[in-house]
């Protein structure tokens, strides 16, 4: 929730919402002062079908903006970087005063971001980095998420063969998460207590691609895998499906993040080790 509150504060500041009454409100947020009155906030989601965005983040953003008196408009790129370019231009055409963008590809989105900035429209990159210094950036501590994932898996499997299922190569978070995981596991890797027997990026964080990659790693290693550090719950689902096909589900530690309902069910069943909620 602190990320949503910080996001609202940035929106209010970007639109000059703190120009009046700042000395009287103390610690109150824009929601309490009506700082968003008359502001239209356009949100470009990379993929609204992701449970985390649809069930938690969007409702929180909508509620905060509504309380501040701001209008919310949105678009869903369906995991298409090309579609997101069009979406952002459409949000501008609809009168967005501020843009919040969860980018599918932090570099591919640059033409639309630069167009917005040239028109004086503030741009906030949400969760994922946009490679433009003019775009504000608010995110979670993804390195710490990676650490927590690795700690949970390593606590269960301190020795053995590890596979790393990373996120989309075009998303900086994939490397932030992997960096945190590496911090925790470096000593064990150096000592040979654990061995990295497979590592891959996953286009669009797609569970089906994660499953295919995991199937390949199982084949390459004759199913001799004891742990999988998967960077989110969707991909963890693909990993578990690959493990189930080989009769290994429940015997291999698997990480994730986002607190998806399906992932929590897998944790309860013992086929997934951890889901980090950020």
Region spans (language model):
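Bacterial N-terminal signal peptides that target proteins for export
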Residues: 1-3
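C-terminal motif of bacterial Sec signal peptides marking the signal peptidase cleavage site
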Residues: 10-14
């Amino acid at each position: 929730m602190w990320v949503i509150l910080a996001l609202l504060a940035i929106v209010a500041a970007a639109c000059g919402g703190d120009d009046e009454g700042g000395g009287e409100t103390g610690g109150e947020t824009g929601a309490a002062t009506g700082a968003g009155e008359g502001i239209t906030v356009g949100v470009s989601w990379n993929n609204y079908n992701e449970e985390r965005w649809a069930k938690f983040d969007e409702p929180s953003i909508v509620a905060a903006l509504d309380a501040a008196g701001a209008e919310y408009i949105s678009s869903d790129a369906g995991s298409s970087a090309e579609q997101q370019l069009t979406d952002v231009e459409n949000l501008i055409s609809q009168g967005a005063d501020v843009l919040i963008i969860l980018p599918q590809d932090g570099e591919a989105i640059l033409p639309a971001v630069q167009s917005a900035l040239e028109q004086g429209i503030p741009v906030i990159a949400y969760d994922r980095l946009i490679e433009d210094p003019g775009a504000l950036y608010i995110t979670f501590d993804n390195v710490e998420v990676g650490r927590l994932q690795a700690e949970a898996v390593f606590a269960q499997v301190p020795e053995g063969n590890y596979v790393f299922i990373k996120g989309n190569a075009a998303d900086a978070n994939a490397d932030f998460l992997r960096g945190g995981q590496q911090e925790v596991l470096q000593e064990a890797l150096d000592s040979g207590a654990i061995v990295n027997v497979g590592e891959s990026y996953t286009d669009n964080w797609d569970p089906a691609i994660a499953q295919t990659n995991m199937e390949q790693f199982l084949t390459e290693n004759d199913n001799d895998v004891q742990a999988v550090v998967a960077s989110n719950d969707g991909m963890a689902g693909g990993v578990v499906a690959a493990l189930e096909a080989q009769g290994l589900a429940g015997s291999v530690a698997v990480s994730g993040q986002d607190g998806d309902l399906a992932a929590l069910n897998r944790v309860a069943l013992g086929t997934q080790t951890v889901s980090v909620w950020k």
